[in-house]
């Protein structure tokens, strides 16, 4: 692509994302499907704005690369060792069983057995990018099914290496094209990368961090990710696997959170680009001429993978309420199929339109997953939120709730337990199925689903409740829920969790005055203990804490008008100096006053 063409393509991608994703969210079909539809619209089979799909698709794989790096940062080697049973047990079983069944069906569809084997392996893989994105949206990350899903995806990435090595063997060209010496050199280079990364990455980042320049740290992070991806690509291996390993090597370093913050903005944009590229690659011409074949293939692919995954989840001991989510989120074909099928095509394994048919099947199967997840979500909501048939009902089952608590993570649990201990009637909304089942055992009245849906709020008793406590992890969900409550349930007294000052400003601007910054109170308490440890009298330390809390809240409110202004930083510095002066003046004034505790303690 020329420079001007690349810039034009970038503008088209951004326009497609900005136009399609909000529309998809309004229709309730999810951001991923919105990206796919946007890609179809601007691709060669849509409006035809972009025709060089292969080059863009290869570049857009960087979205998956960045995603795998961040996942690697969240896992250390000891954690991977703990997951070995699910990775090499369930993951291997899923790939082998699905590939065997699908290969057999492809042979019945007049594929040569060599092409059927490659096709079965490619179709057995799932989309890492789509599955992880949907698991995050559905709150599956913390659940047992989410952890098992990640293990399966990780094994699939590991399976890339032998699958690519298998293609020339099946093509009957092993003697000409398969050089065992080159394979050995690739393995050696991979081992050198592991050893070098283990002992060099942390000292290098320590040296870079010592410069104190944030931009250099971000540049070094990008250099690491892109270099690892390029190195693995040069070896003929999975780029995503290379960056995942780099992330794991840095998972126990002191720079883990800084690395994640540096990469996160690029990850989101490039993942969107990847899904748009997949939509662009959909060959509508093949779809029109082989409509029944493609439709049957998509249904068979999804059903076989779901049945296989459901059976494995049952054998692994996953709760029945989580099995359908686990099976559906991994039921699609994956991005690896594009690479594997292209390699097989270069070895002349496929005949006629076989490769095009397989790629259309993979693309359409990816489009079915968000819709399938949405349908299963509704089914689970009806099943879990309906009247219970057993006699073990919570003690508040027939009462209208006084308070609705949204989210039952560590923050929400403390609030719910406090309210229950004081005999308040509460209803909890939670989208983690495992947490829902556990809470019901302890007598909580709980509804499963997305709290940003008005129907769920109404079913949970929002019209009769007095207050709603919002403890969502994502600030976007919190603000959307605040807007919904103000629009549909204006009588509700809204109390919310704020992750920091930025979220607190947004809540204040939305009219929510009752909120708690999750780390502020605990930090103040630890600060009070620090003052006492330095020799300050406990009562004086308590007063210092109260003064700081009051003055900090005042400054927080005063800075609201300038929250989005360029002068915010200078105003914040001025406010900090003012706070210090007022704090010192008031503390000196109180020290002159006699206090019974100070005098006689």
Curated annotation (Swiss-Prot):
GO biological process, one term: proton transmembrane transport
GO annotations of cellular component type: plasma membrane
Keywords for this protein: Antiport, Cell inner membrane, Cell membrane, Ion transport, Membrane, Potassium, Potassium transport, Transmembrane, Transmembrane helix, Transport
Ranges for domain RCK N-terminal: 400-519
Domain of life (superkingdom): Bacteria
Compartment annotation: Cell inner membrane
UniProt cross-references to Pfam families, sorted A to Z: Na_H_Exchanger (PF00999), TrkA_N (PF02254)
Membrane topology, from the record: Multi-pass membrane protein
Residues annotated as transmembrane: 4-24, 29-49, 55-75, 87-107, 111-131, 152-172, 177-197, 207-227, 230-250, 262-282, 284-304, 324-344, 356-376
Keyword Cytoplasm included in the entry's annotation: no
Family as reported in the entry's similarity comment: Belongs to the monovalent cation:proton antiporter 2 (CPA2) transporter (TC 2.A.37) family. KefB subfamily.
Function: Pore-forming subunit of a potassium efflux system that confers protection against electrophiles. Catalyzes K(+)/H(+) antiport.
Name of the protein: Glutathione-regulated potassium-efflux system protein KefB
């Amino acid at each position: 692509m020329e420079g001007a063409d690349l810039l034009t393509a970038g503008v088209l991608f951004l326009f497609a994302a900005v136009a399609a994703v909000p529309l998809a969210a309004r229709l309730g079909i999810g951001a991923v499907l919105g990206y796919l539809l946007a890609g179809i619209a601007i691709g060669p089979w849509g409006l035809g704005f972009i025709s060089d799909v292969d080059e863009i698709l290869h570049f857009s794989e960087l979205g998956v690369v960045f995603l795998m790096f961040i996942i690697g940062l969240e896992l250390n080697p000891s954690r991977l060792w703990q997951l070995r049973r699910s990775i090499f047990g369930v993951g291997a079983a899923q790939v082998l069983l699905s590939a065997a069944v699908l290969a057999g069906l492809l042979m019945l569809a007049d594929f040569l057995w060599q092409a059927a084997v490659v096709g079965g392996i490619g179709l057995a893989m799932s989309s890492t990018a789509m599955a992880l994105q949907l698991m995050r949206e559905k709150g599956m990350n913390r659940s047992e099914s989410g952890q098992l899903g990640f293990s399966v995806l990780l094994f699939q990435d590991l399976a890339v290496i032998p699958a690519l090595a298998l293609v020339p063997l099946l093509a009957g060209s092993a003697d000409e094209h398969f050089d065992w010496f080159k394979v050995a050199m690739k393995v050696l280079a991979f081992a050198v990368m592991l050893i070098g990364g283990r002992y060099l990455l942390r000292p290098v980042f320590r040296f870079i961090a010592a410069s104190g320049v944030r931009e250099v740290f971000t540049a070094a992070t990008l250099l690491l990710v892109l270099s690892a991806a390029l190195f693995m690509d040069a070896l003929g291996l999975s780029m995503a696997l290379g960056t995942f390993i780099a992330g794991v090597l840095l998972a126990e370093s002191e720079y883990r959170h800084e690395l994640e913050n540096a990469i996160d903005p690029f990850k989101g944009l490039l993942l969107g680009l990847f899904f748009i590229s997949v939509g662009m690659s959909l060959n509508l011409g093949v779809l029109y001429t082989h409509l029944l074949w493609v439709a049957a293939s998509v249904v068979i692919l999804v059903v076989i993978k779901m049945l296989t995954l459901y059976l494995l989840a049952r054998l692994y001991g996953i709760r029945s309420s989580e099995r359908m989510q686990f099976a559906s989120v991994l039921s699609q074909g994956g991005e690896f199929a594009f690479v594997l099928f292209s390699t097989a095509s270069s070895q002349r394994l496929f005949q006629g339109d076989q490769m095009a048919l397989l790629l259309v099947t993979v693309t359409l199967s990816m489009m079915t997953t968000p819709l399938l997840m949405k349908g299963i979500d509704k089914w689970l909501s009806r099943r879990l939120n309906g009247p219970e048939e057993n006699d073990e009902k919570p003690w508040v089952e027939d009462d209208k709730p006084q308070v609705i608590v949204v989210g039952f993570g560590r923050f929400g649990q403390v609030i719910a337990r406090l309210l229950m201990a004081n005999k308040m009637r509460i209803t909890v909304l939670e989208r983690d199925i495992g947490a829902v089942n556990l809470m019901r055992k302890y007598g909580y009245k709980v509804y499963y689903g997305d709290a940003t849906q008005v129907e769920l709020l109404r079913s949970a008793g929002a019209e009769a409740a007095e207050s709603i406590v919002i403890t969502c992890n994502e600030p976007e969900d919190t603000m959307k829920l605040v807007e919904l409550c103000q629009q549909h349930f204006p009588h509700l007294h809204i109390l919310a969790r704020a992750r920091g000052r930025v979220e607190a400003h947004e809540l204040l601007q939305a009219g929510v005055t009752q909120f708690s910054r999750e780390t502020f109170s605990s930090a103040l308490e630890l600060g009070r203990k620090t003052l006492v440890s330095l020799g300050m009298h406990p009562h004086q330390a308590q007063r210092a804490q109260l003064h700081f809390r009051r003055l900090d809240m005042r400054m927080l409110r005063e800075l609201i008008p300038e929250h989005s202004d360029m002068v915010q930083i200078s105003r914040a510095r001025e406010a900090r100096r003012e706070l210090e002066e007022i704090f010192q003046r008031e503390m000196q004034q109180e020290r002159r006053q006699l206090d019974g505790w100070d005098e006689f303690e």
